[in-house]
Amino acid sequence: AMGGEILGIAGIAGSGQKELLESISGLQKLEAGSKITYIEPDGTECLLNGMDPLDIIRKGLLLSFVPEDRFGMGLVGGMNIIQNIMLRTYRRGKGPLTDRKFPRDLSQKIVDDLEVVTPDINRTPIRRLSGGNVQKVLVGREIAQNPAVLMTAYAVRGLDINTSYVIYNLLTEQKMKGVSVIYVGEDLDVLLELCDRILVL
């Protein structure tokens, strides 16, 4: 995917769309003959084959992955939305020993963009949110990292139309900021409307 575009990934069930994203992010090992390269803005190439996710982070490669599974993906059930998103900014060196204000301000802006509908949004713990709201938070959490590449696997599966369009808008905003967005989806009409290019597996 190029910077400032949404690349759609489509294919029949079992063709490996989700596995492709897992391989890019280091969650799944590649078979021999495959090659995944991350190209820095200055043109420097970094081979990601077989690289552990933690090694990808240590190299400072700004890859973010929103998985299909909404449960157990690093969200802390007892924390509210802002606190969960702030945890992601801490990982980038914006933690309590450096600057507390920046991650909180960034997290608040992202929460506003997420359009989460729940009473007392700043106090409600994640575990009390609906599945659709949890999915919004998962997308917002990855956006908080200010990634160069944002990957989503079936980000709107099982969600209502309004929630789906909130997520589509978030992905489009990232594209407009120059982020490379890779979107795995099932709805061909959405892929054609949302994506600049589509890769069929």
Question: Where on the chain are the PLM-derived regions?
Answer:
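Glycine-rich phosphate-binding loops of nucleotide-dependent enzymes
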Residues: 1-201
